[in-house]
Amino acid sequence: MKEKEIQENMNKSIEATQRNFNTIRTGRANASLLDRVSVEYYGAETPIKSLATISTVDSQTISIQPFDISCLQAIEKSISMSDLGITPNNDGKVIRINVPPLTEERRKEFCKLASKYAEEGKVALRNIRRDAVDKEKKDEKDGLISIDESRDNQSEIQKITDKYIALIETKLSEKEKEILKV
């Protein structure tokens, strides 16, 4: 694998980890909280953002305005059944969600969840590293590159991996601070 390809793959893993972090509640209303919620719509699981306009009214309220009023009940049901711990209020045209402040216990649970997402991201980075190192070893074995080149490349791959793992650690600590901030 080329260095650029490795970095592209690792950037994708970082982005996926960041998307996971964005779905964790922090006590403030945020439209990305609903990114993981999907709605049963005409027999297919559809992301909520494909069915409605989602906006934040204030720091504690999310507003969901469906493009098709007929799916209002389905959206409400999906939000209620999600693991977000929030209750939707349906007024017949718009669903409003009041995001309650988090309890200390709930904040700690969300910190654990953030740590889990960070670990998944690091595992993905290590898998990319493993694949790249395996390719280097194969090229060395096949005689395409020298032993020294292979070791230099493996060392460079490790440096890139370390850099990206440190980036995930930084993002995790930022997210934990955001979650624990009262």
Swiss-Prot record:
PANTHER family: MITOCHONDRIAL RIBOSOME RECYCLING FACTOR PSEUDO 1 (PTHR20982:SF3), RIBOSOME RECYCLING FACTOR (PTHR20982). It is found in: Cytoplasm. It comes from the Bacteria. This is Ribosome-recycling factor. Disulfide bonds: none annotated. GO terms for cellular component: cytoplasm. Belongs to the RRF family. GO terms for molecular function: ribosomal large subunit binding. InterPro entries: Ribosome_recyc_fac, Ribosome_recyc_fac_dom, RRF_sf. Its main location: cytoplasm. Keywords: Cytoplasm, Protein biosynthesis. Responsible for the release of ribosomes from messenger RNA at the termination of protein biosynthesis. May increase the efficiency of translation by recycling ribosomes from one round of translation to another. GO terms for biological process: translational termination. The keyword 4Fe-4S does not apply.
